[in-house]
């Protein structure tokens, strides 16, 4: 691979051992320009913050949520063989896993210059995987750069105090010079995917919270087992757990890249997620500005989406849950979807493989929609017991203040990549 006009640190990244990233991973929070004013680790940096370069930022973003080619999909289930298993929501794979290939999340990020959306959820293969070696990194980064959508001209503002962020992060999170990644999950869409999975495997739902069966499912007893339905609370816990794994492994993948690059940073969950989405109730702290609703039945506000940017698969962005289910089916089986015959793929006969998946029938979608609409009407939102839009983990990347670690720690507090970062990535700052 040619590394045209790139700093020598890029070649270090390409040769960095995975084992060293795994065992060298640490939360390194102290950035250039930071200060701890008191206590046993008191220290104030002598240096100004240095923002990530475009190349540094793109490497972190593509490590956290980059497209890695075509998803191979789940290949067989005896229940509907010889049809291809048709769970997946996306045709492309990313650097992190998603339950059954649902892929319902996207990554927002903010830096000194603005706030952005990094859209890779439904991207086609941006990486040309061949038997000849790794793909051309310049081409990969350029393809991913085109997936960035700028939403504002400034860093997201959040007061460095409780209740907006946990007190132990108030001195280090979202600081000048940092890039903060915010994976956001469409839990409404994820729950639709879970309901489809249930019907595909013969399971029905019942409302264990209110002690009710779901009226109308009796018409679909040939599709689902009404004698042994699964509890709503369990299945919504199932959905949020799967979504959490997606958001967290996204951050973890980016965290490994920080070690290879010699950047500081850490993955954490210590910023209030309702504040992040814009549901803090404080008009002075709009953050991402998602729509949210309140209801006396809910202990917390419920974010549903950011219009035209990231809209949840639920009202008000769809008139009802039947329309949301239809939209999810179109994502799967429509143009560009994993089960559309014209979508390219990794197989020698991709059209034959993709078209072998059984398309959701009208009665299948009706069965899913009856359960989804019941939840929406009974609880006033969808899903009923968990948020429609979900945020949990974040990843921050910044330039490390080595003097803090040299002052307070013994040898080995940071990796050689950290020690050499400025000379290998920013040699102009080391001159003179």
Summary of predicted features, one role per range:
Residues 1-432:
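Acidic, surface-exposed loops and disordered segments
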């Amino acid at each position: 691979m040619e590394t045209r006009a790139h700093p020598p640190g890029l070649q270090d990244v390409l040769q960095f051992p995975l084992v060293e990233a795994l065992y060298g991973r640490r939360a390194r929070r102290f950035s250039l320009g930071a200060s701890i004013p008191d206590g046993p680790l008191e220290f104030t940096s002598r240096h100004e913050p240095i923002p990530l370069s475009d190349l540094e930022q793109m490497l972190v973003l593509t490590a956290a949520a980059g497209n890695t080619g075509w998803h191979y999909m789940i290949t067989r289930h005896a229940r509907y063989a010889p049809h291809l298993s048709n769970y997946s929501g996306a045709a492309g794979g990313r650097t992190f896993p998603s339950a059954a290939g649902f892929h319902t999340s996207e990554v927002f990020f903010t830096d000194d210059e603005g706030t952005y959306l990094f859209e890779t959820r439904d991207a086609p293969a941006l990486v040309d995987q061949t038997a000849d070696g790794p793909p051309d990194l310049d081409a990969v980064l350029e393809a991913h750069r085109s997936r960035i959508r700028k939403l504002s001209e400034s860093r997201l503002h959040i007061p460095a105090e409780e209740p907006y962020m946990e007190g132990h992060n108030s001195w280090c999170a979202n600081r000048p010079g940092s890039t903060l990644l915010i994976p956001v999950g469409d839990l409404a869409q994820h729950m639709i995917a879970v309901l489809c999975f249930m019907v595909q495997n013969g399971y029905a739902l019942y409302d264990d919270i209110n002690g009710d069966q779901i009226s109308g499912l009796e018409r679909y007893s040939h599709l689902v087992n009404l004698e042994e339905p699964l509890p709503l609370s369990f299945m919504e816990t199932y959905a949020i757990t799967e979504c959490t794994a997606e958001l967290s492994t996204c951050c973890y993948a980016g965290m490994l890249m920080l070690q290879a690059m010699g950047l500081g940073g850490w993955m954490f969950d210590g910023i209030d997620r309702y504040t992040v989405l814009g549901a803090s109730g404080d008009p002075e702290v709009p953050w991402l500005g998602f729509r949210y609703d309140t209801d006396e039945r809910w202990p917390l506000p419920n974010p549903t989406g950011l219009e035209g940017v990231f809209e949840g698969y639920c009202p008000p962005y769809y008139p009802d849950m039947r329309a949301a289910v239809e939209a999810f089916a179109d994502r799967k089986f429509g143009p560009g979807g994993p089960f559309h015959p014209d979508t390219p793929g990794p197989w020698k006969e991709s059209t034959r493989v993709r078209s072998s998946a059984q398309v959701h029938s009208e009665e299948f979608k009706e069965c899913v929609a009856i359960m989804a609409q019941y939840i929406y009407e009974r609880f006033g939102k969808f899903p009923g017991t968990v948020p429609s839009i979900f945020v949990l983990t974040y990843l921050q990347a910044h330039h490390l203040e080595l003097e803090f670690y040299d002052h307070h720690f013994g040898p080995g507090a940071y990796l050689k990549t950290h020690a050499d970062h400025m000379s290998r990535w920013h040699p102009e700052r080391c001159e003179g």
